[in-house]
């Protein structure tokens, strides 16, 4: 069993209700800092960790705790508790050599006057007549006797779901809010064959090139993502130049176009992952292989424009979404190191060495890339370059992934899929 999250923007509240959300998120922010202060000071003075139970007794009479609903306040204390536990776990890794001491920082306070999540556990969640009701403490209602209940429409698709947690998340300095429903997610029984394999090469214009031994190759189009990023970069630069002349770092307009860009990118990524997984289910593909190199974005140097296009596309989000869907439908998910898969010729069965920074591979490959997107094998056969790379990823991971198993469409132009 895993957990899934549905995130929705909170809309159609009154001005007073939005102000209530801001005040509650500020109280949560203040309480987090109070809890963290207690843990830090105890650590500095005693060189020990202040437990959650002890910290609770220190904070329960604090005005920020009293004004928040008890369950929400306790969850905020637990977040501070987990932050320091993570700090101690990293210190343990430093002792074993897995981490450097210089990279481990003690948890810092949140910005004064800022906003923090409202986290509701099961005992504070109330859903009735299609609406989620935000819990408000008695003390807060005494300060605001005329306030109305905050009712948020509850998604119909979650009517039968087992909620684990609900989070109210402030964004853009409290300009808007999202509500996140965390619920139990179960695997589905799917008829798949582990010998049916799909290999995927991630890219930019070709977001995902998919090659299978039971289906013709296809390419998930990434040019729409490039277009969205190109417009966002251009418009953001224009607005920032205006803002800087007025001594501002950001503006409401910059925030709006950034939110819109992020929503569009997230939509394309999720639809792409869903199309790929649906294709796997349709053809009973039981093994999904993704080409991946660690830090392949961090040290990339392919020119200013190409760097911008490549780095701003969230390929890690696509991999995570595919991994989650693979778990859901009992498909084996594999991440394969993909060095030299673009240079090696799949049709000629070239060797596939592994990249080593201290020892460069000096061998020669049978084929070569003669044009953008076109690869020529030793005997002159032309195939799509990304299809060649994707097939090599499958061959590098599975020794039985060979040309005889591939569909005849490998040598033809792969179909291009555009998600809308």
Predicted regions and their residues:
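Nucleic-acid substrate recognition interfaces
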Residues: 1-420
């Amino acid at each position: 069993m895993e957990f899934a999250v549905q995130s929705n923007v909170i809309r159609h509240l009154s001005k007073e209700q939005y102000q209530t959300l801001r005040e509650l998120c500020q109280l949560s922010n203040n309480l987090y800092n109070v809890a963290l202060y207690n843990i830090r000071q105890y650590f500095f003075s005693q060189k020990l960790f202040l437990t959650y139970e002890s910290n609770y007794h220190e904070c329960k009479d604090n005005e920020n705790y009293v004004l928040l609903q008890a369950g929400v306040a306790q969850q905020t204390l637990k977040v501070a508790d987990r932050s320091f536990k993570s700090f101690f776990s990293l210190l343990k890794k430093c002792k074993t050599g897995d981490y450097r001491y210089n990279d481990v920082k003690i948890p810092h306070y949140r910005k004064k006057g800022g906003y923090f999540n409202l986290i509701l556990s099961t005992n504070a969640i109330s859903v009735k007549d299609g609406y989620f009701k935000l819990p408000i403490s008695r003390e807060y209602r005494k300060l605001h006797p005329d306030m109305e209940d905050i009712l948020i429409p509850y998604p119909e698709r979650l009517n039968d779901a087992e909620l684990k947690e609900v989070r109210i998340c402030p964004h853009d300095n409290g300009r808007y809010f999202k509500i996140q429903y965390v619920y139990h997610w179960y695997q589905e029984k799917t008829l798949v064959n582990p010998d049916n394999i799909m290999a995927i090469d991630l890219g930019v214009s070709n977001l995902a090139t998919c090659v299978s031994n039971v289906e013709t190759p296809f390419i998930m189009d990434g040019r729409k993502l490039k277009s969205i990023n190109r417009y966002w970069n251009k418009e953001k630069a224009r607005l920032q130049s205006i803002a800087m002349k007025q001594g501002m770092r950001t503006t409401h307009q910059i925030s709006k176009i950034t939110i819109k860009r992020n929503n569009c990118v997230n939509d394309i990524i999720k639809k792409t992952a869903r199309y790929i997984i649906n294709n796997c289910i349709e053809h009973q593909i039981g093994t999904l292989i993704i080409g991946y190199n660690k830090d392949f974005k961090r040290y990339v140097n392919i020119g200013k424009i190409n760097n911008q296009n490549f780095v701003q596309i969230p390929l890690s989000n696509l991999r995570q979404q595919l991994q989650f869907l693979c778990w859901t439908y009992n498909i084996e998910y594999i991440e394969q190191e993909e060095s030299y898969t673009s240079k090696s010729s799949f049709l000629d069965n070239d060797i596939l060495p592994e990249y080593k920074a201290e020892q460069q591979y000096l061998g020669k490959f049978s084929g070569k890339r003669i044009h953008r997107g076109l690869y020529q094998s030793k005997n002159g056969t032309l195939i799509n370059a990304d299809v060649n790379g994707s097939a090599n990823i499958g061959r590098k991971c599975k020794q039985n992934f060979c040309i005889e198993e591939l569909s005849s469409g490998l040598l033809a132009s792969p179909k291009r899929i555009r998600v809308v």
